[in-house]
Amino acid sequence: MTYFMLFLGLCFVLGGLGVASNPSPYYGVVGLVLASVVGCGWLLSLGVSFVSLVLFMVYLGGMLVVFVYSVSLAADPFPEAWGDWRVVGYGVSFIAVLVVGVVIGGLVECWDLGVITVDSVGMFSVRLDFSGVAMFYSCGVGMFLVAGWGLLLTLFVVLELVRGLSCGAIRAV
């Protein structure tokens, strides 16, 4: 199980690296899907089934819509692929930063965290992630609405930015 968790963590980092190297929106969506599937599988193996399902629906329902709009509005005739030198340079630099972070974290010895699941202990009969979802929708409804409006505003900002220099609000005067 430890090797499986290590493999999921490595695949999650590689998916994030695929999004961060950003060769083109065509290829960035592949990294996003890989990172979301592996991240939700990682949460599922820790026992957080409901949160994993909700995150999977949000990532694939919300983020892929933004990528579809970006791809349709910023179509490149010759997109950069994974093998281009600039994309490979980004990937190598991100991996170098990750290795430096792991080395510094090993020197500081901050990796003694352990793995904690969401199973309740003792007389409790409700899992902790289900009770957290109930608290989220009861006490946190105001912040939930603010976050929804923020995501809607972000969608409109991204659509306006990728619309083009000649038609959008950001253009040369």
UniProtKB/Swiss-Prot annotation:
Keywords: Electron transport, Membrane, Mitochondrion, NAD, Respiratory chain, Translocase, Transmembrane, Transmembrane helix, Transport, Ubiquinone
The protein's enzyme class: translocase
Locations listed in the record: Mitochondrion membrane
Catalytically driven reaction(s): a ubiquinone + NADH + 5 H(+)(in) = a ubiquinol + NAD(+) + 4 H(+)(out)
Domain of life from the UniProt record: Eukaryota
Any GO MF annotation of the entry: NADH dehydrogenase (ubiquinone) activity
GO cellular component term of the entry, any: mitochondrial membrane
Function of the molecule: Core subunit of the mitochondrial membrane respiratory chain NADH dehydrogenase (Complex I) that is believed to belong to the minimal assembly required for catalysis. Complex I functions in the transfer of electrons from NADH to the respiratory chain. The immediate electron acceptor for the enzyme is believed to be ubiquinone.
Family the entry assigns: Belongs to the complex I subunit 6 family.
Entry protein name: NADH-ubiquinone oxidoreductase chain 6
Organism, as annotated: Synthliboramphus hypoleucus (Guadalupe murrelet)
